[in-house]
């Protein structure tokens, strides 16, 4: 007779892809007639943007564009000039499995880049982008949690796990005309643009969540004067978004990954015809995971006290994900300027942040590196550029043991000029770690009891058990009830602490 089991459905996130995909981007740019000739390229700033991610079958398609700002000097070398261009790209990823309702996030970064002036009017750019891709699907498992039959003894285990409610990709548009403050010179060319999205509050509610935050925009631009230095401008675009997810509630835990998306910055004329307005068009995408904490109970072993017993088991992988509170790290290093030739810092920024989380003995650690970029003016009134890669390791106590991952961003960078050859740079980082605890569980899949088999006659026995033996194993060997062995031997422990005789009575 096939035994009926009570089952519980468990929904968990299954990661069907986690890796880095390379994507080449090659382009060339010819300066318009109104631009000055290139004497020297100072810096090429590449900002890759993912515009869409779509799944079909076991294939994932990622579309985006690489936004490039090239800073260069003309023959005089006394002012920064620049141009910008964009190049679209498409990348395909083969998933490990075909699944429905796949959600994926792709974080682009620059792996390698060459920017070369072929002549005074043309620039060749060869870029290799890396796409850090993570794709998820919700897997549904039926787990046996008990057998309601007095002829069967069951052994159960409980796991505190994370239940998947849903994963949502949420894109929205932020658009604003930002006016320069009084006293700022009009804009001729945007030389550098960076956008950082900051999440301030996340409020779960029935059917989704309300997310508030802001987009922090920094601009370096060139004025219409060949003798004036480039100027900086920053602004904030606040946002409030409602993210919908079926089945979500106030008891959900929410994790948000902010993907940059599209970014377009265009100077616009004001009412008197001067370019003192910046039109900002941003289209960020949030990858929002909704989860709930729960307890899963599995029947990991069973046997019959009457009749022949045949059971089939399956192995399960259950997970508990813990998002640790954000941590701030300060990295302070010196950036050296060649030939003691520093007069003025025109701009400083950081790029290329990479983070790796790992464990070291009883501690958790995050190893990271990023590049500090410095645009400055020399004592001879010439414009120059230098950069330095900084690395750091942050060690702290590991309160939870598991597979660690980390996300982070540089929230601010400050500097102090200590002398004509040294700039002391201080970068503030915000990091958020996630710990995945994986449980290898065993669960009953099916079982049959042969009722035609004659039950064994009543018997009593004495078994001489060794220290360390489990009461369950002894009861299973003799097809006896665990409760009877505990009662007859006055033994409440699961594992015997000493050698002793065990009375076994089976009715």
What is the meaning of each model-derived region?
Residues 1-455:
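Interfacial loop/beta elements and low-complexity acidic/Ser/Thr-rich segments
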Residues 52, 201, 460-461, 471, ...:
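Residues at structural and domain junctions
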Residues 448-464, 469:
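Strongly charged, low-complexity linkers/loops
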Residues 465, 471-477, 482-487:
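Short alpha-helical segments in extracytoplasmic peptidoglycan/chitin-binding modules
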Residues 480-507:
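Extracellular LysM carbohydrate-binding repeats and other cell-envelope/extracellular binding modules
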